[in-house]
């Protein structure tokens, strides 16, 4: 996959992508990440990329022409078609199903806004989709772009050392439930013991426990996800057992 990022601070994206899963994906040739700065395509001695908004008001607005020229250069760098995605608090919420859709693309261009935003005419003419990473406002789109890069990169074949890691994540699978708890060594600690079932070697019992914990944790923390999940009789039985086994002080 190739991802081009248009940003006034492309080095920020490069630094975020230099480590962990995304860095490893680049080393393996599974991800090509390229930053583009609109200031490099601005005119005049000051290479201005923003100006005051019509109608007055605070802040500055990113100008059409530097962005248009920058986008043209980014698109020309690779012949494959690429949707242009603007990171915006007004966009479609980024979810795991949407991430899976985007991960199937061979290429995408991410646009990071700054100041009060981007001239609406550029958004109308050049942007295919707006995506939000949450109902809050950041100083710019770079953090959102870094999140999106990470989310879609880890879904690429060969990026994770164990493909099952992604399949068992929260929000994955047809039900989109939260993940179950995980434990490692030591088995006994002052802060608690590892559940006995995980040390039993009984794979059927372990699978049942993990499924029940996934259902129960979703019910406790994100109950609205269960409204959209299709649970069979076994799932409903496991969830009911989980509810009954809760200590009185832990009940919702």
From Swiss-Prot:
Signal sequence coordinates: none
EC number(s) per entry: 2.1.1.228
Keyword terms: Cytoplasm, Methyltransferase, S-adenosyl-L-methionine, Transferase, tRNA processing
Catalytic activity: guanosine(37) in tRNA + S-adenosyl-L-methionine = N(1)-methylguanosine(37) in tRNA + S-adenosyl-L-homocysteine + H(+)
Pfam families: tRNA_m1G_MT
Cellular-component GO terms for this entry: cytosol
InterPro entries reported for this sequence: Alpha/beta_knot_MTases, tRNA_m1G_MeTrfase_C_sf, tRNA_m1G_MeTrfase_TrmD, tRNA_m1G_MTases_N, tRNA_MeTrfase_TRMD/TRM10
GO terms of biological process kind: tRNA N1-guanine methylation
Principal place of residence: cytoplasm
Annotated compartments: Cytoplasm
UniProt-annotated binding residues for S-adenosyl-L-methionine: 113, 133-138
Superkingdom in the source lineage: Bacteria
GO MF terms, alphabetically ordered: tRNA (guanine(37)-N1)-methyltransferase activity
Principal EC category: transferase
CDD domains hit by this protein: TrmD-like
Annotated HAMAP family: TrmD
PANTHER family cross-referenced by the UniProt entry: TRNA (GUANINE-N(1)-)-METHYLTRANSFERASE
Assigned protein family: Belongs to the RNA methyltransferase TrmD family.
Record note on quaternary structure: Homodimer.
Role this protein plays: Specifically methylates guanosine-37 in various tRNAs.
Protein name per its UniProtKB record: tRNA (guanine-N(1)-)-methyltransferase
Gene that encodes it: trmD
């Amino acid at each position: 996959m190739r991802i081009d990022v248009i940003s006034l601070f492309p080095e920020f994206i490069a630094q975020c992508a230099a480590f962990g899963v995304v860095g490893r994906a680049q080393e393996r040739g599974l991800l090509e990440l390229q930053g583009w700065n609109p200031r490099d395509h601005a005119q005049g001695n000051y290479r201005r990329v923003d100006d005051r908004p019509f109608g007055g008001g605070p802040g500055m607005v990113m100008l059409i022409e530097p962005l248009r020229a920058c986008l043209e250069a980014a698109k020309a760098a690779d012949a494959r078609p690429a949707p242009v995605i603007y990171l915006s608090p007004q966009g479609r919420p980024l979810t795991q199903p949407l991430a899976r859709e985007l991960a199937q693309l061979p290429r995408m261009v991410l646009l990071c806004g700054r100041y009060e935003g981007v001239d609406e005419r550029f958004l109308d003419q050049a942007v295919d989709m707006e995506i939000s990473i949450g109902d809050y406002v950041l100083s710019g789109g770079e953090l959102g772009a870094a999140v999106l890069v990470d989310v879609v990169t880890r879904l690429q074949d060969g990026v994770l050392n164990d493909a099952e890691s992604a399949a068992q994540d929260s929000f994955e699978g047809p039900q989109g439930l939260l993940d179950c708890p995980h434990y490692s060594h030591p088995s006994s600690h002052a802060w608690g013991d590892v559940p006995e079932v995980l040390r039993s070697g009984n794979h059927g019992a372990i699978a049942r426990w993990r499924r029940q914990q996934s259902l129960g944790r979703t019910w406790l923390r994100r109950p609205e996800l269960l409204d959209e999940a299709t649970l069979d009789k076994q799932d409903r039985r496991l969830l009911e057992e989980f509810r009954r086994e809760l200590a009185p002080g832990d009940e919702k």
